[in-house]
A protein has these predicted regions:
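Catalytic alpha-helical scaffold of carbohydrate-active enzymes acting on polysaccharides/glycoconjugates
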Residues: 2-141, 148-207, 227-241, 275, ...
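Glycine- and acidic
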Residues: 21-31, 100-111, 139-140, 212-216, ...
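Short, flexible/disordered intra-domain loops and linkers
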Residues: 23-34, 75-77, 256-269, 653-658
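Aromatic- and carboxylate-enriched substrate-binding clefts and catalytic-loop regions
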Residues: 139-144, 150-332, 452, 457, ...
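Terminal accessory/anchoring regions of large secretory-pathway or extracellular enzymes
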Residues: 263-265, 272-928
Length: 928
């Protein structure tokens, strides 16, 4: 193709989202008022530009609706003329819409069935506001996910749903998803064209459409200069055909309509909005405004690439902005409890223990109508990214209310399905003969989703741990009785605060493919006082079994964690610490000495435990107190850690500020990092880069290497990386040995629970690449670096002008955090299937039914999960919001709204140094 034939296709894509984390549900600027204002101005500007008869004809737009449920509903309710104008422009084929989601969901936070239903409703729904219903024939089959989130398995689902490609940021500043992770770097043909985007877990692929934001315009001085740079690449043959430049950014940004400036500097490029784009295209005959639906079929595919980490356009190109606040863990744990109830129901159905109630259970969980309050509908609404961020470290109070209302409804539906399943399944249990003994029925949760990857098998033993009914605990205590399980399953009975807890290791051999549940009988026996001699032991300075040995120094610090004689830990392994103080040079606070207490010495032959207490002050009179219970079981190669941290409450007078924030909750910015139980593995990348394995909610097990310096050497050391979506566990390995870290979702859960800190040459001795792992904690620090063919100023000015680089650590102030971990050392690269299976069933523990021999009563030890709804109502005062649909709630919020009354806004004037002002001035001149 000769140069005269080559075009630059310029696609403009405003990202429309009226549902925000740092604003509420007001019709004014404290809510979605700015969205209403800017959306109207964009359409007005398009009309004016069209009336001016530029050479290119109508300016084409690729509208990017983040969701139907909030944004389109609100447009239809409060801005129907605007929605009608978009519909009309699409009818005239000036515009198109690209694919987002029905519920503004973080798509990697969903399972397969949920994502497929979300996409289905996005396109067509009974509310009548699906993209295909509103914009027939103008739905481009290309997705721009909310926050450009991506994880493995999405490509396969997109292929099934007819989605042909995905728009992902490949930007030069910290509003990006792919740039630091794609190796080799995309060449010019790929950066301004199409790339085959491969899955790392199958042979599936889709189109990658590299996408850019307004910050990238800054990096090239102006849109006109950027066009000319691309043209030079076409002239030199670096781009051998047409080029595509897709510009996608939040619709509520003033950059679309133009920034008001003093008259003396109105000449500045990058401030003129759509009109500036129109003038540039009008002056350059080789540039055309384009819709993706029209131009992508004309473009060739240039090479291929794979993105191995899980990514989003948050801080550090990952999930920091939605996963690292204290409330993110708290909220997600609520959701996982609802999920547990749902999965119990599905497991009982798939095990053919429920037949009569199958249809009503399925209707409650997965009704295909978006008008029905099903579990899946409310799970999708709950999993909106807005309910978890972007606002940091606090969310808007109204956003907390709506978020909790959706998890409340999801739990309500899951509980109803659970009760129907138990009602039928328990009748079969009641019919079984007990011979005067307690009967226990155990159901490992094997049905966790729609796909084969979400159907689990039992490939290992697993841990069963539950409190006995009060009447049984009383009888055991009163009559000095113990428990014998007739099947001779390893177990221990432990008493704490008057209640008895039974802990068992259930052998894999008890299950088979035809029957993935078992019955056990509990016999009361005389207490045995004989001590069992084996290699299970807890002393004042060590904890060990046949596989693992943990040692403590004279200060009570854990300094060695050995598996089969090989060291897996470093000094201060499992340390609690807080980084507090100045942003650039904070102090790290931690305990100088830990108290150790032997809880179980191992003499019962089943388990041994040590409690480690750490206490330190951040400020005088402001202590942090951490308790960690470390447990080993006989003949099991795993360490279990129960963590309970009480953080002191240090509040300040700072608050989150941007041009539209209405979050007034104050905090102390000196909170920088929080490490509740920091893992310091002795796993060194001295021969190759370290590797992370993880399992996501689609059931996909995948890995990524910590090789970001191959893309950009400046990213050899990374202060925080949150690039692993995790349904239960992740591992770190140097391909010779590895360590799996998993969590119990019913205690604490987070979809990205382990931020990482990476050092190329180690944290103390220069032995090789090292990593710190921070379960349920928070790291912070310098952002990633972004290679560029531009001036590099997008990254510099982006940090100056954006207030989103806030630490989430202040959200932990005054909070109590409890979580349970499993640490499983292993040899090799990929974790063995046996360890994966154990971690899977630790994450979502088995469901248990007990039958009392006296009154034949059925008891459920996990019944507290069923009461979550009442807990949510008490804590979050949601009686009002759960009694309304969303539009009723919005009208309730706005019942006293006065559009003429000024609304408070948290704004902060620009405080620019001389260097920054000179950069902006010189770049402005160069952009002319």
């Amino acid at each position: 193709m000769n140069i005269d034939q080559k075009k630059i296709f310029f696609a403009l894509s405003p990202h429309i989202n009226y549902y925000h984390s740092y604003r509420g549900d007001s019709k004014g600027v404290a809510g979605f008022g700015k969205d209403i204002e800017i959306m109207g101005k964009i359409l007005d500007a398009l009309d004016v530009i069209e009336d001016e008869k530029f050479s290119f004809g109508p300016m084409k737009i690729s509208w990017d609706y983040a969701d139907n449920f909030w944004s389109i509903q609100l447009q239809r309710e409060f801005q129907e003329d605007v929605l009608d104008r978009v519909v009309e422009r699409c009818k005239q084929k000036k515009d198109e819409v690209i694919i987002g989601s029905w519920a503004n969901t973080g798509q990697p936070m969903l399972d397969t069935e949920e994502l497929m239903q979300d996409i289905t409703w996005h396109l067509e729904n009974e509310m009548g506001i699906g993209l295909k219903q509103l914009f027939p024939g103008r739905v481009a089959p290309y997705a721009r996910t909310q926050e450009t989130m991506f994880t493995q398995g999405m490509i396969e689902i997109y292929n099934k749903m007819g989605i042909k490609g995905i728009c992902m940021y490949y930007s030069t500043y910290a509003f990006d998803s792919l740039r630091p992770f794609i190796y080799p770097r995309l060449n010019a043909n790929q950066r301004y064209g199409l790339v085959k985007f491969n899955s790392s877990v199958s042979k599936s692929s889709t189109l990658l459409i590299p996408t850019y934001g307004f910050g990238d315009v800054v990096d090239y001085f102006s849109i006109k200069r950027w066009f000319k740079l691309i043209r030079k690449m076409q002239e030199k043959g670096q781009i051998d055909g047409h080029a595509l430049l897709l510009l996608n950014f939040d619709m509520d940004a003033d950059y679309w309509t133009g920034i008001k400036l003093p008259r003396i500097i109105r000449w500045m490029p990058k401030t003129g909005g759509l009109r500036e784009f129109a003038k540039a295209v009008d002056q350059l005959d080789y540039v055309e405004f384009a819709n993706l639906i029209d131009v992508i079929p004309k473009l060739p595919i240039h090479g291929e690439c794979t993105c191995y980490p899980d990514v989003a356009d948050g801080l550090w190109n990952g999930f920091y902005s939605w996963a690292q606040k204290y409330d993110n863990t708290k909220f997600w744990t609520y959701g996982q409890k609802a999920r547990w109830l749902k999965c119990v129901s599905d497991t009982l159905v798939s095990n053919v223990l429920v037949k009569n109630n199958t249809d009503p259970i399925n209707k409650i969980i997965r009704d295909k109508s978006d008008l029905i309050e099903s579990y899946i509908k409310n799970k999708c609404l709950f999993a909106s990214t807005t309910n978890f961020g972007l606002s940091t470290p606090r969310l808007h109070p109204q956003r907390i209310k709506t978020a909790i209302s959706y998890v409340y409804r999801a739990h309500k539906a899951a509980r109803k399905a659970f009760e129907l399943a138990i009602d039928e399944a328990s009748k079969k249990l009641i019919q079984q003969d007990q011979d005067g003994h307690y009967l226990i029925q155990i159901f490992p949760i094997t049905d966790r989703g729609l796909s084969e990857d979400e159907k689990l098998t039992i490939d290992s033993d697993f841990l069963l741990k539950f409190k006995l009914p009060d009447e049984l605990s009383v009888e055991l205590s009163k009559n000095q009785k113990g428990i014998f399980i007739e099947e001779k399953i390893p177990h221990g009975l432990y008493t704490d605060d008057g209640s008895s807890t039974l802990e068992c290791i259930i052998p894999k051999s008890k299950f088979n493919a035809e029957k993935e549940w078992i019955n056990l009988t509990l016999n009361l026996t005389s207490k045995s006082v004989s001590k069992i001699k084996n290699n299970l032991q807890a002393t004042s300075n060590s904890l060990s079994n046949k596989f693992i040995k943990i040692s403590f120094d004279d200060q009570g610090k854990l300094y060695t964690f050995k598996f089969n004689g090989e060291e897996y830990g470093q000094q201060d392994f499992l340390e609690t610490a807080v980084s507090f103080g100045d942003k650039k040079n904070p102090d790290r606070f931690t305990s100088l000495k830990n108290e150790l207490r032997v809880l179980r010495d191992g003499s019962d032959g089943f388990s041994a435990s040590i409690v480690m207490k750490s206490e330190f002050e951040i400020l005088k009179g402001y202590p942090v107190i951490a308790l960690k219970k470390l447990t080993l079981y006989a003949n099991q190669p795993y360490l279990f850690v129960e963590t309970d941290v009480q953080f002191c409450d240090i509040q300040g007078e700072d608050f989150f500020v941007n041009d539209t924030s209405s979050v007034y909750t104050t905090y102390d910015v000196r909170w920088r990092e929080v490490m509740p139980c920091e893992i310091k593995p002795k796993i060194i990348g001295d021969k190759d880069y370290l590797r992370v394995w993880k399992k996501n909610y689609f059931g996909k097990v995948s890995y990524f290497d910590l090789d970001m310096e191959k893309v950009d050497s400046r990213n050899a050391n990374i202060d925080c990386l949150v690039a692993n979506i995790t349904d239960g566990w992740m591992t770190l390995t140097n391909k010779e040995k590895g360590l799996l870290i998993g969590y119990n979702s019913l205690k604490a859960a987070n979809f990205a629970f382990t931020p990482l800190k990476i050092k190329k040459s180690g944290f103390s001795k220069p032995e090789g690449q090292e990593v710190r792992i921070n379960p349920f904690g928070n790291y912070h620090g310098e952002l990633l670096k972004y290679w560029t063919k531009g001036c590099g100023h997008a990254a510099i000015l982006g940090e100056k002008f954006s207030n989103h680089n806030q630490s989430a650590a202040p959200s932990y102030s005054g909070k109590n955090l409890k979580f349970d971990l499993i640490l499983a050392p292993y040899l090799g690269d990929r974790p063995p299937s046996q360890i994966i299976s154990f971690a899977d069933h630790f994450c979502l523990p088995p469901f248990i039914i007990l039958k009392n021999p006296e009154n034949k009563k059925i008891e459920i030890p996990q019944s507290d999960i069923m009461e979550l709804g009442e807990e949510l109502k008490r804590e979050f005062d949601i009686d009002d919001v759960i009694s309304m649909n969303y539009l009723e709630w919005v009208n309730h919020v706005n019942k006293n709204f006065d559009p003429s009354a000024p609304e408070e806004q948290l704004k902060e004037g620009l405080n620019l140094d001389l260097k920054t002002m000179l950069i902006m001035l010189i770049d402005g001149i160069r952009g002319l």
